């Protein structure tokens, strides 16, 4: 996606520049960069604004009849629920979701990915099996919520802000983190819910960003640790230790045992060094949350440009949040390397349609109050902008939630749209870095994989600068292009992968953002 160009006009009521963006010649709307007052004339569109248009919101540039399709990005983003006049605000009061045929055109847009002649590297930690870590944590996982408190007590003992002496001799260890959850029992022992939980825990237990892992249970839970290890092909060893509260003799003894086991792991965990490795060892989870009308104009395409640079150097990017590509999936199926890969994506879309129907929900309920306040109206519009995170390379594989990602290039993982749940699945699949775009303002952070956050607009950057790592609002201001800022972001991702701490890491985020997807009934 090339950089948008802001068309400038002069208002009829005052001599001042009026900034709007037309994203595609076929669009029926332009996007306001500033608040537009009623009576403002958009000269290049030959339109006079009627009513107040907030920044990031849409202005109709032609009359649209009731039931007609309305286009943004050159694609259908919804249908007029009432007649829309040129110059009017286009939003929830006059634009709605609607069904329409999508041409999946499986694999018809596949293009050869030309490897870059310019190498890219970062300073990573090479594990014994050849995988590369971007961070070096000791993790404490729980098989069930019942062991969450003891897990947290063990990790708190090693917190540098509480007991700085505990890790003073181990500067190469990034920390000891407890990743707890609210499930693990009173669910179907043969159901999908337990399988997903075990797949998620298994992915974290063997994640390269962990130098060692404890798995703690209560003892009588449905999610038995022995079965967890068996289903995930894991075995206990010096860097993966398991035990239960019931077998250990209660809370106090369990906490003491956990602290002692972590102490035993620390010397080996600290005995690492970073070395220069290829960017092909990066697997980046792509996220967006608190999206606004600028997300698909700035931060998402900037991330997409960085993804293209990564993929051309042999790296991997994981696009996810299935409800947030809904209605735009045909843009990905065209890029699927085979029709079979494209059909996998369509199958996940159909699963979500059935899942939403069973729950008495509608996928179009996905846009949040914040999304709508920021200018997004339908899930179609949100999806069209969200797909921009994926850049322009081929879609090489589709995975279910938390499955190990083994393919190189752009892949898709089926996840909900809720950011912590989605990112948890990506990290379980092997993501060693997360990149997160936001327009309304997110404070998300992740452990053990660091999260880099991009602001879609300068107002957010200024308002919430201590949570943001890059300001993509510069694209709107014309001081840079999507391609240029994408290159800046790519270097930032390499720097963070090399050990530079992201904003969320500086604030200590990550322990509470581990949220496995729960789809089972709780009995």
Question: For each of these PLM feature ranges, what is it?
Answer:
Residues 2-433, 437-523:
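Metallocofactor- and cofactor-centric catalytic cores in central/energy metabolism, strongly enriched
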């Amino acid at each position: 996606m090339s950089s948008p160009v802001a068309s400038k006009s002069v208002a009829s009521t005052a001599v001042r520049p009026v900034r709007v963006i037309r994203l595609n010649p076929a669009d029926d709307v332009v996007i306001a960069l500033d608040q537009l007052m009623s009576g403002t004339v958009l000269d290049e569109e030959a339109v006079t604004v009627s009513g107040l248009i907030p920044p990031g919101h849409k202005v109709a540039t032609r009359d649209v009849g009731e039931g007609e399709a309305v286009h943004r990005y050159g694609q259908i983003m919804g249908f007029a629920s009432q007649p829309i006049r040129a110059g009017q605000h286009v939003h929830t009061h006059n634009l709605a979701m609607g069904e329409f045929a999508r041409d999946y055109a499986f694999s018809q847009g596949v293009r050869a990915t030309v490897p870059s002649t310019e190498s890219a590297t970062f300073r990573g930690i090479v594990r014994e099996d050849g995988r590369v870590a971007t961070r070096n944590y000791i993790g404490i996982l729980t098989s069930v919520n019942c062991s969450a408190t003891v897990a947290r007590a063990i990790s708190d003992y090693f917190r540098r802000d509480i007991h700085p002496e505990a890790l003073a001799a181990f500067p190469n260890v990034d920390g000891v983190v407890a990743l707890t959850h609210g499930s693990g029992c009173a669910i179907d022992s043969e159901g999908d819910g337990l399988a997903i939980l075990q797949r998620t825990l298994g992915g974290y237990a063997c994640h390269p960003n962990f130098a060692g892992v404890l798995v703690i249970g209560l003892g009588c839970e449905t999610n038995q640790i022995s079965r967890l290890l068996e289903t995930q092909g894991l075995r206990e060893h010096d860097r993966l230790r398991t035990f239960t509260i019931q077998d250990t003799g209660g809370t106090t003894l369990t906490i003491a045992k956990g602290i002692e086991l972590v102490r035993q792991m620390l010397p080996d965990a600290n005995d690492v060094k970073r070395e220069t490795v290829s960017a092909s060892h990066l697997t980046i989870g792509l996220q967006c949350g608190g999206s606004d009308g600028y997300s698909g104009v700035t931060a998402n395409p900037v991330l997409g440009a960085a993804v293209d640079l990564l993929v051309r150097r042999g790296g991997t990017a994981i696009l996810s949040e299935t409800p947030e590509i809904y209605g735009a999936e045909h843009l990905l199926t065209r890029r699927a390397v085979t029709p079979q890969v494209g059909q996998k994506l369509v199958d996940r879309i159909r699963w979500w349609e059935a899942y939403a129907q069973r729950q008495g929900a509608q996928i179009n309920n996905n846009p949040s109050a914040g999304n709508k306040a920021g200018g997004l109206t339908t899930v179609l519009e949100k999806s069209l902008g969200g797909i921009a995170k994926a850049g322009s390379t081929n879609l090489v594989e589709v995975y279910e939630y938390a499955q190990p990602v083994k393919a190189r290039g752009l892949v898709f993982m089926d996840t909900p749209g809720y950011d912590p749940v989605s990112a948890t699945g990506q990290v379980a699949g092997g993501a060693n870095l997360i990149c997160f775009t936001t327009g309304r303002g997110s404070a998300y952070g992740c452990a053990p994989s660091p999260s880099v956050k991009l602001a879609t607009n300068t107002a957010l950057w200024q308002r919430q600068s201590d949570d943001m790592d890059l300001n993509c609002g510069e694209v709107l201001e014309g001081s840079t292009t999507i391609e240029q800022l994408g290159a800046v972001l790519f270097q930032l991702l390499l720097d963070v992968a090399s050990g530079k701490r992201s904003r969320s890491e500086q604030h200590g985020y990550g322990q509470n953002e581990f949220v496995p997807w729960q789809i089972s009934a709780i009995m």
